[in-house]
Amino acid sequence: MDERELQALVERISLDVFHKPFRHRAVFNDRLRTTGGRYVLSTHHIELNRKYYEQYGEEELIQVIKHELCHYHLYLEGKGYRHRDRDFRELLQKVQAPRFCKPVLLSKTKKEHYYKCTSCRYMYVRRKALDTTRYVCGFCRGKLKKIKREC
């Protein structure tokens, strides 16, 4: 699904479900990691997570769009648009939109760097690489050497 199709889908859902037009932009935001989407108050745009669409499909994306459109329409009407507001919860029930979305499964590879002290043989395991010319062993002040993991 590209940006044009997404915009058309959001406009159609807004008219079919809420009977009100959506007059702003709906875009995919690849920086979203843990949420399905968000409504931006300052611009009134709706940003959606592309990974959420790829993981769960169009049906779940429609649910997220309905949720974000609840924020959108309530804010423009001057009603309570936050999750804790009664107006928001009532509109969610009326349009059968979820209050929270399914969690996005992150496929983050865990890379580790291994260093060994040349003097005391202490093994360091780190997530971030370090410059072995600037750092020394914390126990004996010996030099560190980057090694490959021993299985």
UniProtKB/Swiss-Prot annotation:
Pfam families: SprT-like. Keywords: Cytoplasm, Metal-binding, Zinc. It comes from the Bacteria. It is found in: Cytoplasm. One of its GO terms (biological process) is response to stress. Zn(2+) binds at residues 67, 71. The keyword Zinc applies. The active site is at residue 68. NCBIfam families: PRK04351.1 (NF003339). This is Protein SprT-like. It comes from Anoxybacillus flavithermus (strain DSM 21510 / WK1).
